[in-house]
Design a protein with these regions (language model features):
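Two-component/phosphorelay signaling modules centered on CheY-like receiver
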Residues: 6, 13-33
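Alpha4 helix (beta4-alpha4-beta5 surface) of REC/receiver domains from two-component response regulators
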Residues: 66, 86-102
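Receiver (REC) domain switch/output surface
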Residues: 95, 112-124
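Active-site residues of response regulator receiver
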Residues: 56, 83
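C-terminal output helix
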Residues: 89, 107-116
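Acidic catalytic/metal-coordinating carboxylates
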Residues: 37-40, 61-66
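Active-site beta3 strand of CheY-like receiver
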Residues: 47-54
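C-terminal output/effector regions of signal-responsive regulators
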Residues: 124-125, 131-212
């Protein structure tokens, strides 16, 4: 792969840590953090903010899956999980915590580089999907605001739907701002005006009843 990554590695075995520190630069990557426990990995990732994590599962004080979950809560990054054996339950946990690749020891050089590329590509795809979902949610919220403001203009100014929308567009153009910003201003102004209107209605004298 062309991209050079800053990588954090964690394993309770010194030989494995040394191996990863030696082999990753051969792919053009920089090892920025090395840890022997899960908690140490979490702390070093907070300090270094790596692009990718390669971590063993079985480690003292906090296993690799729990450490990866904690790291990704702080800032999402791709994680490659390493284990001495296949374990169905561990794989299910790993899936829940968004582990993007899984390697079984002994790690071969021919397997490591593709795993890094796959994890990075999957992470970028997931991030794009999350952003798309966030954009969609924001678009729906914006549409709701605009519809509410349009309905308010129809009620207050006696406009039909098209006229109300054109007025929103004209106001946005005059103020050089987005349609949703104009809608928010109109709704905010209405919220401020409602107590005044209610007080005025309350103090307005009622109809006189004829006497005699």
């Amino acid at each position: 792969m062309d991209r050079h990554l800053r990588i954090a590695v964690a394993d309770d075995e010194l030989d494995m840590r040394d191996y990863l520190q030696a082999i990753l630069p051969c792919f053009g990557h920089l090892v920025v953090a090395v840890a022997s426990t899960g908690r140490e990995l979490v702390e070093k990732c907070r300090q270094e903010r790596p692009d990718l994590v390669i971590t063993d599962i079985k480690m003292p004080d906090m296993d690799g899956i729990a450490a990866a979950s904690q790291i990704c809560k702080d800032f999402p990054i791709p994680v490659i999980l390493v284990s001495a054996y296949h374990d169905h339950d561990l794989l299910e946990r790993a899936g829940e915590d968004h582990i993007l690749a899984f390697l079984v020891k002994p790690i071969k050089q021919a397997d490591l580089e593709p795993a890094i590329a796959i994890a990075t590509r999957r992470f970028e795809q997931f991030q794009a999907l999350r952003q798309e979902a966030a954009d969609l949610r924001q678009a729906l919220e914006n549409r709701k605001l605009i519809e509410r403001a349009k309905g308010l203009l129809m009620k207050r100014a006696g406009l039909d739907e098209n006229e109300a929308f054109r007025r929103l567009q004209r106001l946005a153009s005059e103020r050089n701002c987005k349609l949703v910003e104009v809608a928010a201003m109109i709704l905010t102004a209405e919220e401020a005006y409602q107590p005044v209107e209610r007080a005025r209605d309350k103090n307005r004298p009622g109809p006189r009843h004829p006497t005699g």
